[in-house]
Curated annotation (Swiss-Prot):
Organism: Avian metapneumovirus (isolate Canada goose/Minnesota/15a/2001)
Location, primary (coarse class): host cell
Main function: Mediates the regulatory switch from transcription to RNA replication. Acts late in infection by inhibiting viral transcription and up-regulating RNA replication. Plays a major role in antagonizing the type I IFN-mediated antiviral response. Interacts with host MAVS and prevents the interaction with its upstream partner RIGI in the signaling pathway leading to interferon production.
Keywords recorded for this protein, A-Z: Host cytoplasm, Viral RNA replication
Domain of life of the source: Viruses
Family named by the database record: Belongs to the metapneumovirus M2-2 protein family.
Subunit structure: Interacts with host MAVS; this interaction inhibits signaling pathway leading to interferon production.
Subcellular location: Host cytoplasm
UniProt protein name: Protein M2-2
Length: 71
């Protein structure tokens, strides 16, 4: 896990029991300054994009890797 805070770009590799490995890249409008903010954003994105679209159960999702950038 490589965290550069503050950041505006977040890359996350997640593993879902049904769909295997999935790469999520988020370009944020606002800066993320803390790890707590980062966790909230990643959690929200996983629920919004992966759980709701692919109908994967949250219990089956595992975060493998997180990388953040400023620009």
């Amino acid at each position: 896990m490589t965290l550069q805070l503050p950041c505006k770009i977040v890359q996350t590799l997640i593993k879902c029991g049904e769909h295997g490995l999935i790469f999520l890249k988020m370009k944020l409008d606002d800066m993320v300054w803390t790890k707590n903010e980062l966790v909230d954003i990643i959690s929200t994105e996983i629920v919004k994009v992966h759980a709701n679209i692919f109908k994967c159960r949250l219990e089956d999702i595992e975060i493998i890797y997180v990388n953040t950038f400023l620009s």
